[in-house]
Curated annotation (Swiss-Prot):
SUPFAM superfamilies: Actin-like ATPase domain. It comes from Paracoccus denitrificans (strain Pd 1222). Substrate binds at L137, V138, S139, G140, G141, D170, G183, N280. It is an enzyme of class 2 (transferase). Its EC number is 2.3.1.234. Fe cation binds at H115, H119, D308. It comes from the Bacteria. Pfam families: TsaD. The lineage of its organism: Bacteria, Pseudomonadati, Pseudomonadota, Alphaproteobacteria, Rhodobacterales. GO terms for cellular component: cytoplasm. This is tRNA N6-adenosine threonylcarbamoyltransferase.
Length: 356
């Protein structure tokens, strides 16, 4: 009896090298992620050259480990899916070249996957969510509202015009002397903080639509920090905690209000969130409340599938393959690759890869 499709997924768009084996019944047989946090810790952010070299060193090992965990050989697979963009081009190229080599050597079908589609389709993998649904994709390099109508049918309703939220979290952590990655550090510090102590702005809430901006909020945190340092000669731990709590509350409030507008603009039975910042519990709580107001179900992936992983790439590859997609040896690595080809290009570029 047929076991259905089984795909290998390969992900290397930023600072996580990953491989996974996934079946079309939504079973994740293996998911391997080799992070690079230690390599970039001294630089306050991801260094593209260091990331690319690390991907080149780890990709084949991750694939071997994923196959071993799944108890499969390459000959047991039905296809290979690989992130072909958007992202840091050196890492994306490493993954694409490995996938091409494996496809050429085995004769397996090759499917190039948009990294953002991997995040956007994660609710299909984790919960079997039917189309359509509204997706808030919120990560280190990207932030956009998408109506998802199919594996390659996305309508962008709005997005960030400057920094992505994850980038803002990283920069605020750096300003306050907290370790990277900034998201978990800021969230941890905020638990002991008073979000009401500092009057931080809620950017673009006075303008209609679903576009977002976070660079002014980051600058406001910088000003408050500098005022505290000038007044008392440094920052106390409570100062850091209060600044983190205020910043986190501002981000959550902005995203909640813009999500409310997106649901009004494109009503959907399900509101989903994905991307690394979707792991933030304050944000999840705010989005859950917005979904309840609109009579929608709120879904967020398990934390291990919020951040970059190859299981989502394998799944997106399966969906694209079932829709008739095939790629050849001319598959190109793309630093920019908008999900909604009809929408105007987003402004700016995030630290973790080009906006799309």
């Amino acid at each position: 009896m047929s076991m259905g499709l089984t795909f290998l997924g390969i992900e290397s768009s930023c600072d996580d090298t990953a491989a996974a084996v996934v079946r079309d019944d939504r079973s994740i047989l293996a998911s391997v992620v080799a992070g690079q946090a230690a390599l970039h810790a001294d630089f306050g952010g991801v260094v593209p050259e260091i990331a690319a070299r690390a991907h080149a060193e780890k990709l084949d090992l991750c694939v071997e480990e994923a196959l071993a965990q799944a108890g499969l050989r390459l000959s047991d697979l039905d296809g290979i899916a690989v992130t072909a963009g958007p992202g840091l081009i050196g890492g994306v190229l490493s993954g694409v070249m490995l996938a091409k080599g494996l496809a050429a050597g085995t004769g397996l079908p090759l499917v190039g996957v948009n990294h953002l589609a991997g995040h956007a389709l994660t609710p299909r993998l984790t919960d079997g969510t039917p189309y359509p649904y509204l997706m808030l994709l919120v990560s280190g390099g990207h932030c956009q509202f998408l109506r998802v109508d199919g594996p390659e049918d996305f309508t962008r309703l709005g997005g960030t015009i400057d920094d992505a939220p994850g980038e803002a979290f990283d920069k605020v952590a750096k300003l306050l002397g907290l370790p990277q990655p900034g998201g978990p550090s800021v969230e941890a510090a905020a638990r002991a903080g008073d979000a009401r102590r500092f009057a931080l702005p809620r950017p673009l809430l006075d303008r209609p639509g679903c576009d977002l901006s976070f660079s002014g909020l980051k600058t406001a945190v910088l000003r408050q920090r500098d005022e505290l340092v000038a007044a008392q000669g440094g920052l106390h731990e409570q100062d850091r905690a209060d600044l983190c709590a205020g910043f986190q509350a501002a981000v959550a409030e902005v995203l909640a209000e813009k999500t409310r507008r997106a649901l009004a603009l494109a009503p959907a039975p399900v509101l989903a969130a994905a991307g690394g910042v979707a792991a933030n519990q304050t944000l999840r709580t705010a989005l859950q409340a917005v979904a309840a107001e609109a009579g929608a179900t709120f879904l967020a992936p398990p934390l291990r599938l919020c951040t970059d992983n190859a299981a989502m790439i394998a799944w997106a590859g399966i969906e694209a393959y079932e829709a008739g997609r095939r790629d050849g040896m001319d598959l190109a690595a793309r630093p920019r690759w908008p999900l909604d080809q009809r929408a105007a290009p987003m402004l700016g570029a995030g630290k973790r890869g080009a906006k799309a």
